[in-house]
Amino acid sequence: MITASDALERLKEGNQRFLSGVRSIDTIVKQIQRENFVEGQEPFAIILGCSDSRVPAEIIFDQGLGDLFVIRVAGNIVAPSQVGSVEFAAERFGTPLV
């Protein structure tokens, strides 16, 4: 297990690669798409899923950044806060699918 400090550094390095356009993965976000994220988001689906780090919704559904509004919860128990997040996305973004 790595330390919290090492984990934070790893996240910062990954974010820096993303910002500079240098990626270590095959899935690439085009520059024009990244610029569109500044304007807001228009997710086409709301995913309420497991918080298991091995199951990232964007990867398992082969979708890009901004395509999904993902709410992750541990223990398969949906609390009012998660329901509120689903309601927020549906109302704010007009997302048609939960």
PLM regions and their residue ranges:
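Short, electropositive, low-hydrophobicity segments enriched in small/polar residues
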Residues: F18, S53, A79
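Long, non-catalytic terminal segments
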Residues: M1-F37
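Divalent metal-coordination and catalytic microenvironments
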Residues: L11, I47, I71
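Short HxH-centered metal-ligating active-site micro-motif
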Residues: A4, I59-V98
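Conserved active-site and cofactor/substrate-binding residues in soluble primary-metabolism enzymes
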Residues: I2, D6, E42, V55, ...
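Fold-independent oxyanion-binding glycine-rich loops
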Residues: G14-N15, G21, C50-S51, V73-A74
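N-terminal short beta-loop-beta anion/metal-coordinating cradle
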Residues: D26-G66
